[in-house]
Amino acid sequence: MSFLNIPAGRRFDLACLGRLAVDLYAQQVGSRLEDVASFAKYLGGSSANIAFGAARLGLRAAMVSRVGDEQMGRFLVETLQREGCDTTMVQVDPERLTALAILGLKDRDTFPLLFYRENCADMAIAADAIEEGFIADCRALLITGTHLSQPAVRAASTRALAHAGRHATLRVLDIDYRPVLWGLTKRGDGQTRFVPDARVTASLQEMLPQFDLLIGTEEEFAIAGGVPGDLLASLRRVREITHAAMVVKLGPLGCCLVAGAVPERLADAPTSAGERVEVLNVLGAGDAFAAGLLTGLLRGEDFASAARLANACGAIVVSRHACAPAMPTPAELAHWFGGRRGADVAADAQLAHLHRVTAPRARWDELNVMAFDHRSQFFELARAAGAPESRVPALKRLLVRAAERVEASRGLQGRMGVLVDDVYGEDALHAATGRGWWVGRPVELPGSRPLRFDGGPSLGTRLVQWPREQVVKCLVFYHPDDAVDLRLEQESRLREVWAATRDSGHELLLEIIPPRDTTDAAHADAAVLRAVQRLYTIGLKPEWWKLAPMQASGWTALAALVAARDPHCRGAVILGLNQPLDDLAKGFAAATHAIVKGFMVGRTLWAEPAREWLRGDVGDDAFIAAVATNFETLVDAWRASRPHAAASVPSPAPVHDTAQPALRPA
């Protein structure tokens, strides 16, 4: 870079020091904050948003801050870690609580904001805990303005800057002026973005010489320079104090660079035009801008390319509800710059799909799933055994224990899963959730054709109450040659499931079973493949397909279809249909293609032991042992069909798509 000296060959590209907080975003857009009924929880805080966004774009990012020793602090640390951001320097405070912000979206110009930061953890960063060796391992250090506003955090920032100066680490200030956090407004007025104040100006100017790059809006440079209403005069005052390069954010007009002397007109400075988009939420756009700008600069881009990337990141985020989770991925930016996006960002289905499937997510290279989400079958088992229906929930809790046993005996950590309903299996479902298993949960009314939803038609309302880790499983008896009215009705219901999961953030598994009365065995594979193709054609892109065993040629054809229609699909799993274990093993042997990730089998494993348990012929331990033995046999058959599957696989962890395209704007 001609205007910045950035070291190379270090462990981290960027460390961000500053606010790390929980954001609660109002879900009712257009509502007064007083009238908001529900909120969505996200990672927040300007520095944290930048670290998160930079990590998502592929930088080796790290966070320097402090959280409380409680659930919200752990949420923030885990969220950063899932994104690939280092949290070694995130201190844990045993006495203070994690910071909190509550945000509303009243209209395109009104975004009420409440900061709950009284004696919060991130304002108590211990300066002596910021290690010089850590800062020396960073190519750049970014600090946001709030952490210059109080003595304790100012001391921490000063210490980090001193370390950075000794090791030629690039020092960046995002001015991030929040008058309320400098005590200049009422505590409830977090929305006001500019209040002139000589004390703040003097405080900032004392620190400016310690930075190499300054990032700010027109108002933020006005407070830094101290000449309200005259941006050029403020920039000249800043230039008298520091040689730092200045990047001025101009909102929808883009940004400009002042690397040397301040020009007579701002238009004479190198400028990158902004993106025109419909604004939903301006909160966090500046953080997305900084993440994009620093990603470009740290990757050796010139200012024009880095600024174009920054402007795109900001434009995408202002069109979405959140800040950190709204940050784009490299795949989204490739789509953005590839000329394939629509004028309405919010309506760009492909951009939304890429955002969903290319952000880091839990990795499932293999799945060994016991399915006991059956409802009518368990009811019939109980009735045939003369047992009360009320015993079924206890039976399902025992199935979780059987799954636990097999996870341990076969080393299935990171490859274990269950399918459980919430009718008879609510307790079992709760027991399975939150332990690192793949957990699926059905929505279809058993046996319905045309498809109906169990629990009523308001699927979206139900999903709000589901843990995000649970996968929505929908079984449909579907054939592409069904009568037109039936096919269209079923496709309409499937679109509802698709739309509901896109809104809720849950993954979707579609289980496709062609009806036996219209599908002979010789054409079963073709019927399934045509069904999958048809559902792709109408716009559905589920994360998972659950299909009956096919010939090897069928799986090869499926892989080609998925690669063409949705290369980010997680893959397919084999269903059981109550087939004998030996028959399933033969099906596994034909399913060696990488598109097949595992199996989801139910009655084959537990039907006969359940019958005996419901009759009272065996006790809990014998039932668990019998089911576990069947499950182990099936796991062994799966491993025998693909020897590499027996290798140890780590627990699910976020995976970054290393095949994502480069970020360079076209």
Model feature map: region roles:
Residues M1-L14, H163, G226-A349:
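Conserved phosphate-binding/catalytic region of the ribokinase-like
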Residues S2-D86, D109, I125, E278, ...:
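Glycine-rich phosphate/adenosyl-contacting loop at the front of the ribokinase-like
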Residues R60-G145, A334-A343:
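Conserved N-terminal subdomain of the carbohydrate kinase-like
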Residues G342-V484, D582-G598, R603, A607-A666:
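Alpha/beta catalytic barrel-like cores
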Residues R401, R405, P457-V471, H479, ...:
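Alpha/beta enzyme core
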Residues T433-E444, Q490-L509, T556-I574, A625-A640:
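Alpha-helix-loop-beta-strand connector modules within alpha/beta enzyme cores
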